[in-house]
Swiss-Prot record:
It comes from the Eukaryota. Residues 85-96, 104-115, 147-179, 231-245 have a biased composition (Basic and acidic residues). The gene is IVL. Part of the insoluble cornified cell envelope (CE) of stratified squamous epithelia. Residues 62-71 have a biased composition (Low complexity). Belongs to the involucrin family. GO terms for biological process: keratinization. Disulfide bonds: none annotated. Pfam families: Involucrin2 (PF06994), Involucrin_N (PF10583). Directly or indirectly cross-linked to cornifelin (CNFN). Residues 1-319, 347-387 are annotated as: Disordered. The keyword Cytoplasm applies. This is Involucrin. Residues 28-37 have a biased composition (Polar residues).
Length: 387
């Protein structure tokens, strides 16, 4: 809808009442009035209703409840239409107010469009800072890697060559530091950036036109807390930058101390020689320790082999003992059998004065004679005791 069509229209009460009276009822109600000249009762009657007729009185058919309800709705529809017509002028009065607010909002939106340009400049500066920081970190990582490689070379190269290279590297490193910008200049530049941002914001505030309407002034007042939040965020960023600068200063100081220590190293070659000698001793001790660790499993294997040999020898010795015991048992059994046979033979009793020649019993073939002491124990004691 255009602005010309949505202008508010106010009517006097007299005209509005005449319009209400002249509103035609719907077609359904007109037909009902033509059919029923007499007013119908409000509640629907279930019983038969008779209409007075002059000549031919006839009973009127029963009207169901469902036909009564649409008639009541037909009477309510014109009232609803009138209520809607009264609401339309009020809505038309509200709509122009909204249309008046639209140009004001457009002006405020145009003012906001100018702010992203300053934000883009600020973002570009921040991106440059992050890139510089990344480059600085990359340089630090390269220096650390170079130091590690340098230490590895120190262990491998002789002392004289190492000292010469160390002096050359120190000279190169000092030249690089002299060529690089000092950290104090970087600090000054970073401190100037927030001041430049404040000046830029002041210029933007001056360039903005003065508010012509109170509604624009209210819109700006609503924007002020948002701008304050942005300023707080910028202040936090500045604080973080200051902390980062402090860390950078500490790192530069540590680097200076490291350089001083490196400069003092050539003045103390004896200490370096002692340190290298200690390192070589430690390496030798580690090699000896590793050699011992390698020898231990070999010694363990030899010890196990010896134990296995001893076990095998013990098994052989036990087998021999078992064989000897078996032979000894067999010999004793044979001797017992011989003694039993001798006891069964008649014994000659010698007379006094006669000497009896005692001949040792000859064992059968394949048997071993017992020692003399055992034979004497087994001999019969003469003379026999008389009971």
């Amino acid at each position: 809808m255009s602005q010309q069509q949505t202008l508010p229209v106010t009517l006097p009460p007299a005209l509005s009442q005449e319009l209400l009276k002249t509103v035609p009822p719907p077609a359904n109600t007109q037909q009902d009035q033509m059919k029923q000249p007499t007013p119908s009762p409000a509640p629907c009657q279930k019983g038969p209703s008779e209409l007075p007729v002059e000549k031919h009185p006839a009973p009127v058919k029963q009207v169901p409840e469902q036909e009564c309800e649409p008639q009541q709705q037909d009477h309510q529809e014109p009232e609803l239409q009138l209520g809607r017509k009264q609401q339309e002028p009020q809505e038309q009065e509200v709509h122009p107010g909204k249309q008046q607010q639209k140009p004001q909002e457009q002006e405020a939106h145009l003012g906001k469009k100018q702010e992203p340009q300053g934000q883009e400049v600020h973002l570009g500066k921040q991106q440059q800072k992050t890139q510089e920081q990344e480059v600085h970190l990359g340089k630090q990582q390269q220096e650390l890697q170079e130091q590690e490689v340098h230490l590895e070379k120190q262990l491998q190269e002789p002392q004289e060559v190492h000292l010469e290279k160390q002096l050359q590297e120190q000279e190169v490193h000092l030249e690089k530091q002299l060529q690089e910008p000092e950290p104090e200049l970087n600090l000054g530049k970073q401190q100037q950036e927030p001041q430049e941002q404040e000046a830029y914001l002041g210029k933007q505030q001056q360039e903005l036109p003065e508010p012509q309407d109170p509604e624009l002034h209210l819109g700006k007042q609503q924007q002020e807390p948002q701008e304050q939040e942005v300023q707080l965020e910028k202040q936090q960023e500045a604080q973080e930058q200051e902390l980062h600068l402090g860390k950078q200063q500490q790192e530069s100081q540590e680097q200076e101390l490291h350089l001083r220590k490196l400069q003092q190293v050539p003045q103390e070659p004896q200490d370096q020689e002692l340190h290298l000698g200690k390192q070589q001793q430690e390496l030798q001790e580690q090699e000896v320790h590793l050699g011992k660790q390698l020898q231990e499993p070999q010694e363990q294997e030899l010890h196990l082999g010896r134990q296995q040999q001893e076990l095998q020898e013990e098994e052989v010795h036990l087998g021999m003992k078992e064989e000897q015991l078996l032979k000894h048992v067999e010999q004793q059994e044979g001797q017992l059998e011989q003694q039993e046979g001798q006891l069964k033979q008649p014994v000659c009793i010698p007379t006094p004065g006669q000497v009896q020649d005692i001949q040792p019993a000859q064992p059968p073939k394949g048997e071993v004679l017992l020692p003399t002491e055992k034979q004497q124990k087994q001999e019969v004691q003469w003379p026999l005791k008389q009971e």
